Each structure stands twice: as structure tokens, then as C-alpha cells.
Swiss-Prot record:
It comes from Francisella tularensis subsp. novicida (strain U112). GO terms for biological process: protein folding. This is Protein GrpE. SUPFAM superfamilies: Coiled-coil domain of nucleotide exchange factor GrpE, Head domain of nucleotide exchange factor GrpE. GO terms for cellular component: cytosol.
Length: 195
């Protein structure tokens, strides 16, 4: 082999070696890039998971709030319906009260004739029947005589001195009060003691 051929072979050998080294370096660099890319992908995946978890938590919170709001709406509607049932006859009850008052006033008068006594008994039965119907529908009479005056339940029409009773005691009742299912329909008109 001539020197030139040897030199060419050596150059080719060097070229092959260099090419192999370059190729190895490229593979290493490519592997590093791939590893970096996998790490980046992992970070991105973690970020995506975190975003999805946050969104999921937000949707859960919104769903719970919507459920609570629907429950409140349902309860409010039930309460409104219940109140409508309880107090729907309030106007009716209020309009009947003067009838009861008139019957009770008629019953206070003494009657001596036999016919008038029978009529009075009939009125008493009618009044009792009317009061029973009102009670059945949630209307209650207030009989406050002897009780302490309560401006929420009673209307003071007059004040009188009486040392036998404490101040603000109801001495007499001009007109009975009425409640419908615990709510005042008409306050009792009363005379109270003021010493």
C-alpha cells in the first residue's frame, strides 16, 4: 500500500471515527431533548390535571350551592303554601266577628216572655255553632279579663283606678279579641287598671 493510500485510509478512518462521534453526540443530544420533552410533557400534564381538579372543585361547589338554593326555594314555597292555607280565611273570619258580637249582645238582655226565652235558646245554639265552626278553622277567642295588658293582643279603651288589682291588669273586656292560627285578627278592647 502506498503512502497516499494509507493516508486516505487513515483519513477515512478518522472521518468514520469522527462521524461516529458526531453521530453519538447527536444521539445523546437527541436523547436529552427527548428526556427534556418528556419532563416538559409531564409538567404540562400535571398543570392540566391541576386545572381540571380546580375546575372539578369549582363545579362541585356550584352544584352544592345550586342544590342548597333549590332546597331553600322548596322550603320557602312549602312555608308560603302552609301560610296560605292557614291564613287564607283571615278576611272571612274578620267579617264574621261582628255577627258573633251582635249575637252575644242580644244574649246579654234579659227576656221574660216564654217565646222570647225559646228564641234566646235558639240564638245561644246558633252562637255556639258559629264559635265551634270558627274554632275548627283555627279562630280562637281571647278572654283576657284578669290578665296583664299586652299591646300586641289588647287595645286599651279606658283606664280605671282599683286598689284591689295591680296596674295594667285587665279589669273588663268591651269586645273580645280573636286569633287565627296564633295571629291576631282583632285585638281585644279592654279596660285596664291604672292606680
Amino acid at each position: 500500500m502506498s503512502k497516499q493510500e494509507k493516508s486516505n485510509v487513515e483519513d477515512k478512518s478518522l472521518d468514520i471515527e469522527t462521524a461516529a462521534q458526531v453521530e453519538t453526540a447527536q444521539e445523546s443530544a437527541s436523547g436529552a431533548l427527548e428526556e427534556l420533552s418528556v419532563e416538559e410533557q409531564l409538567e404540562r400534564a400535571k398543570d392540566t390535571i391541576k386545572e381540571l381538579e380546580d375546575s372539578c372543585d369549582q363545579f362541585k361547589d356550584e352544584a352544592l350551592r345550586a342544590k342548597a338554593e333549590m332546597e331553600n326555594i322548596r322550603k320557602r314555597a312549602e312555608r308560603d303554601v302552609s301560610n296560605a292555607r292557614k291564613f287564607g280565611i283571615e278576611k272571612f273570619a274578620k267579617e264574621l266577628l261582628p255577627v258573633i258580637d251582635s249575637i252575644e249582645q242580644a244574649l246579654k238582655h234579659e227576656v221574660k216572655l216564654e217565646e222570647a226565652i225559646a228564641m234566646k235558646e235558639g240564638i245561644e245554639l246558633t252562637a255556639k255553632m258559629l264559635v265551634d265552626i270558627l274554632k275548627k278553622n283555627g279562630v280562637e277567642e281571647l278572654h283576657p279579663k284578669g290578665e296583664k295588658f299586652d299591646p300586641n293582643l289588647h287595645e286599651a279603651m279606658a283606664m280605671i283606678p282599683n286598689p284591689e288589682f295591680e296596674d295594667n291588669t285587665i279589669f273588663d273586656v268591651f269586645q273580645k279579641g280573636y286569633m287565627l292560627n296564633g295571629r291576631i285578627v282583632r285585638a281585644a278592647k279592654v279596660v285596664i287598671v291604672k292606680n
